[in-house]
Amino acid sequence: LVGSEMGIRDRGEILAILEEKAKAGLDVRVMFDGMNEMTTLSYDYIERLHKVGIKAQTFSPIKPVLSTYYNYRDHRKITVIDGQVAYTGGVNIADEYVNKRERFGHWKDTALRLDGSAVQTLKALFLTMWTVTGIEDKTDMEHYLQEKPQQRKSQGFVLPYGNSPLTYHKVAENVYLHLLNTSTNYVYIMTPYLILDDELVRAMTFAARRGVDVRIIMPGIP
């Protein structure tokens, strides 16, 4: 299984590799947000991927009907390979993200490569959104969830998490609040979007007042 959930552009080296893997018999799945169909992708993009053997779905496609569901967007960047390796972070599939094409000057982004038990959670997040977005055989999903990544010895831990319209708890906000409220030395945050509610502002303020080094890096171009 090669599963990819992220922003995507029309053509490029990565898509050529995905086509090659699909032709070799691998189960390749691509899911992207419906806003891409309004900005960067052609109207028949899903059909074109299907023709080369890539399973593809759109999260919350844009339709000519007014709906509050259009506020639900998929901004995750997740790639899972064979249930053993996963990538996540801020990188979409586009040339400007590796500075092969200049749109906004030099692009600085961050992504992580994970192996070990954390891969299982990212795979579950991807497959959950895949089943919600389209129709899929649940036994097929169970097959992939039963795959176990190789164990890795580590002195720390990695805990992937996700928010979606399916969750009623503010998982991401609670994670940040916990980190801020329990910090003793420093908290460094790098984010493209800084939209703080009063609770997060108070947590940052209290952390700074008790001597914690709180730093935030944001992009120069919003």
Question: Model segments located where?
Answer:
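Charged, low-complexity intrinsically disordered terminal segments
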Residues: S4-E5, R9-P222
